[in-house]
């Protein structure tokens, strides 16, 4: 009887420890497993089809649908505050006009965000700090346009306890990354972006594998006629995960969201099955998630 109670006690503790693990910790365990067989989903600027891009609602929607990472863009205001905004100007995505760097945060907070159809909504421009607090423990964030002022970004990460939530990416050489970003390489995830259509793509990958051993590479190529695409996927297998973007047709040999709407096996399926892709950034996260569940890849 005591043995039975003991076994049930251990089982209870095990279940409790799994439940206590945050969603971010679960995602990180997959990111750091080069043999991971599930596919991680990245929502480009959040769920922008159903909420304004780079808004807290777009991020919340992505969390609720089960997305793993949201890609967001960071800009700096006149008074040095970091906000979410893709463009250097306010015109396209807000009710304001002019350059972000010429507006102070309090003034930007009086504006409303526009949706994908350029219609005014109730949503405000979020600060990076507000975003980090919404994401905390629930989803990871890929910060775009934040490289040049990452010292300030990192202060907010430490303040909010979200340093382990962040993915940074860039197309610089390994030497440049070590020189410019070196003090953060053991604190946040850094992924190289490699354009496979460029002459020294393979050497760049080899350099990063040798010196930094990144958890993943973001790869780009225009056409399946590129002879090294499959070679690179084979090289990275068991070493680093492969990330492709399906936002438009020139980013992944035409195997994009549009192709996937017509034939998902030729779009997403090709990237996953033929190129061993384990991270996909998409403008259609709900559609991709449904496909992955159907394929038992979630």
Residue ranges of model-derived segments:
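Phosphate-group recognition and catalysis centered on beta-loop-alpha active-site segments
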Residues: 20-298
């Amino acid at each position: 009887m005591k043995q039975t109670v003991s076994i049930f006690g251990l089982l209870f503790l095990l279940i409790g420890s799994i439940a206590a693990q945050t969603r971010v910790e679960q995602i990180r365990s997959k990111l750091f497993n080069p043999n991971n067989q599930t596919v991680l989903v990245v929502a480009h600027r959040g769920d922008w089809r159903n909420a304004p891009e780079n808004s807290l609602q777009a991020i919340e929607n992505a969390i609720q649908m089960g997305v793993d990472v949201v890609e967001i863009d960071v800009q700096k205001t006149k008074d040095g505050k970091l906000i979410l905004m893709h463009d250097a100007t306010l015109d396209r995505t807000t009710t304001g006009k002019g350059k972000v760097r010429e507006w102070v945060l309090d003034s930007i907070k009086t504006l409303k965000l526009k949706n994908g159809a350029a219609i005014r909504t109730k949503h405000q421009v979020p600060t990076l700090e507000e975003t980090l607090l919404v994401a905390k423990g629930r989803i990871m964030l890929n910060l775009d346009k934040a490289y040049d002022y990452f010292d300030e970004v990192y202060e907010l990460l430490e303040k909010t306890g979200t340093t382990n939530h962040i993915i940074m990416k860039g197309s610089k050489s390994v030497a440049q990354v070590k020189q410019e970003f070196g003090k953060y390489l053991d604190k946040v995830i850094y992924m190289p972006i490699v354009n496979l259509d460029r002459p020294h793509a393979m050497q760049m990958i080899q350099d990063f594998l040798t010196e930094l051993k990144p958890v993943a590479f973001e790869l780009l190529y225009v056409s399946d006629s590129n002879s090294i695409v499959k070679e690179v996927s084979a090289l990275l297998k068991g070493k680093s995960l492969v990330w492709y973007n399906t936002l438009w047709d020139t980013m992944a040999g035409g195997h994009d969201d549009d192709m996937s709407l017509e034939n998902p096996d030729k779009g997403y399926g090709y990237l996953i099955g033929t190129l061993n892709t384990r991270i996909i950034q998409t403008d259609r996260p709900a559609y991709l998630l449904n496909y992955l569940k159907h394929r038992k890849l979630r």
